[in-house]
Every structure is written in C-alpha cells, then in structure tokens.
C-alpha cells in the first residue's frame, strides 16, 4: 500500500511565510527556506510553497527561493503561485522544484495542464482547487481563484474531473470554509473528489487535532494531508502526528 503523506504548507507573501483564517488576516510565521528545512529534518514527507500574492499582484514566484530551498531540503517540494506559462513551469522545475501547482492559470487556460503534463510529465503537474460550499445549492462547492477572491462559478467536483482528464497528476484541494479554522477538514468535499478521480488528492484546510488528520485519510480518502497552523504554531510536531497515525494502523512512513 502506498504510504500516506504529511505535507507542511508554507504560504508565502513578500518572501515570508504567513498564515491566516479563511484566506484573510495574515500574520508572519517565518522564513520559508528556514521553515522548509526544519520540517524536512523533522520528518515531513513533502513540502508545499504557495506564493499566495503572486497571482493577485501579477508577479512571478520567486525562483531564488526555490533554488535556495532545493539546496537545503532532502524531500520533494511543490511550488505554486503566479505560474501562467510553460516557461514559468520550466523555470521553477529547473531551479529545483519537484512539482508545480497551477490554480488561477489552469482555470483561465485549462490547456496549460495538458501542455505541462505532456512536456514535463503528469507527476510534475499539481492542480490546486480552492473550494467554498455553495450556500444555496446542496452538495455543491464553488471554485475560487486569485487567492480566494473571485468565484468562478465552476463546480469543484466537475472541475476536479476535468483537470484529471487534462493530465494533472495530483489535486491539492483546499476547503476555504475550513482554512485556518482548525475545525477539521471538509471530509464530505474531500471524499466526493477522491471518489471521482484516480489521482492523489491532498486534503487542505482545517486541521486542528490528530483525529482530524486521521479522518482526512480514513473518511476523506485523501492520499495526503496538508498542515499549516497546527505546525507553525507548535501545537503538534510531525513526529507526534506520525506516531499517532502509525498506532492507528495507517500506512505512514516512520521517522528514522
């Protein structure tokens, strides 16, 4: 059985890691390369760096940060934010990223997914979906872009199926309702999408305790759990989470 993954998420704004609640109220959480290095040594399986202001401010993700990170960490890492072309993907992969995450740009031009997958391989192309529950229509989640600012009107489940068909190798699924709240992942949303696509789904948004992380895997059917506030604030360590999940008989790579 494929090992389930724990992935610290570092939201980057102006070269610093930040954390907020429901995509707003950002506060400083440290230097991205230093934090990435710390989590790598602490036993994380992968890392995700998301330049959350890159798309909104229309500037490209800092290649320098990727290069410095690749020299410092020993685990795979994904970079997203402001990537809107094959050249942009190529630049980040050449700088040392293992995968790139496409979000707003994939909605604007879905062919970027297939072109990226054809040129660099599906394993390099992650599509990030920021989803928010539709208050008027049951069992519907809307896809948001531009750092959660704009509702596209797209149905998140249908969009997930489309990005798989276009060649995405993985989906990074963030519940905007859960983001930073520590009230638990949106299990219903995660399971709906994990059941619809045969590629890994990373659950994101809402982890507040050990049980939440277990439920993302057992109930939500996710392949990985993204963690931010819980780790940045020192409430839990990766070791504590892994030891708990191993005791719960989940297939987790132990810390050596």
Swiss-Prot record:
Protein name as it appears in the record: Imidazole glycerol phosphate synthase subunit HisF
An example of a Pfam family matching this protein is His_biosynth
Output the lineage of the source organism. Bacteria, Bacillati, Cyanobacteriota, Cyanophyceae, Synechococcales
Write down the EC number: 4.3.2.10
Per the record, the similarity remark reads: Belongs to the HisA/HisF family.
Entries under NCBIfam families matching the protein: hisF
For this protein, what reaction is catalysed? 5-[(5-phospho-1-deoxy-D-ribulos-1-ylimino)methylamino]-1-(5-phospho-beta-D-ribosyl)imidazole-4-carboxamide + L-glutamine = D-erythro-1-(imidazol-4-yl)glycerol 3-phosphate + 5-amino-1-(5-phospho-beta-D-ribosyl)imidazole-4-carboxamide + L-glutamate + H(+)
The main place the protein resides is cytoplasm
Enzyme category, top tier = lyase
Active site as annotated: 11, 130
Q: Where in the cell is it found?
A: Cytoplasm
Function summary: IGPS catalyzes the conversion of PRFAR and glutamine to IGP, AICAR and glutamate. The HisF subunit catalyzes the cyclization activity that produces IGP and AICAR from PRFAR using the ammonia provided by the HisH subunit.
> Which UniProt key words apply to this protein?
Amino-acid biosynthesis, Cytoplasm, Histidine biosynthesis, Lyase
| Gene Ontology terms, MF aspect | imidazoleglycerol-phosphate synthase activity; lyase activity
Organism in which the protein naturally occurs = Prochlorococcus marinus (strain NATL2A)
One biological process term from GO is: L-histidine biosynthetic process
Taken from the UniProt entry, a GO cellular component term is: cytoplasm
The entry describes its oligomerization and partners as: Heterodimer of HisH and HisF.
Q: In which pathway does it act?
A: Amino-acid biosynthesis; L-histidine biosynthesis; L-histidine from 5-phospho-alpha-D-ribose 1-diphosphate: step 5/9
Gene3D superfamilies, from UniProt? Aldolase class I
């Amino acid at each position: 059985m494929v090992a389930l993954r724990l992935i610290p998420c570092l939201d980057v704004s102006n070269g610093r890691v930040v954390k907020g609640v429901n995509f707003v109220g950002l506060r400083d959480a440290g230097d991205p390369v230093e934090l990435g290095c710390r989590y790598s040594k602490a036993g994380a399986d992968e890392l995700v760096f998301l330049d959350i202001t890159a798309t909104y401010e229309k500037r490209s993700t800092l290649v320098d940060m990727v290069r410095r990170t690749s020299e410092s960490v020993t685990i795979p890492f994904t970079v997203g934010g402001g990537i809107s072309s094959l050249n942009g993907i190529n630049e980040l992969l050449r700088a040392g990223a293992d995968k790139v995450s496409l979000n707003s740009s994939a909605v604007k031009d879905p062919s970027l997914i297939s072109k990226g997958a054809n040129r660099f391989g599906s394993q390099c192309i992650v599509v990030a979906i920021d989803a928010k529950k539709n208050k008027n229509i049951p069992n519907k989640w809307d896809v948001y872009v531009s750092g959660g600012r704009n509702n596209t009107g797209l149905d998140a489940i249908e969009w997930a199926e489309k990005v798989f068909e276009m060649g995405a190798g993985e989906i990074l699924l963030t519940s905007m309702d859960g983001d930073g709240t520590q009230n638990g992942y949106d299990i219903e949303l995660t399971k709906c999408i994990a059941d619809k696509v045969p590629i890994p789904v990373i659950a994101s948004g809402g982890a507040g305790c050990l049980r939440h992380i277990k439920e993302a895997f057992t109930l939500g059917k996710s392949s990985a759990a993204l963690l931010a506030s819980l780790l940045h604030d020192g409430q839990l360590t990766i070791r504590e989470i892994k030891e708990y999940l191993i005791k719960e008989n989940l297939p987790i790579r132990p810390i050596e």
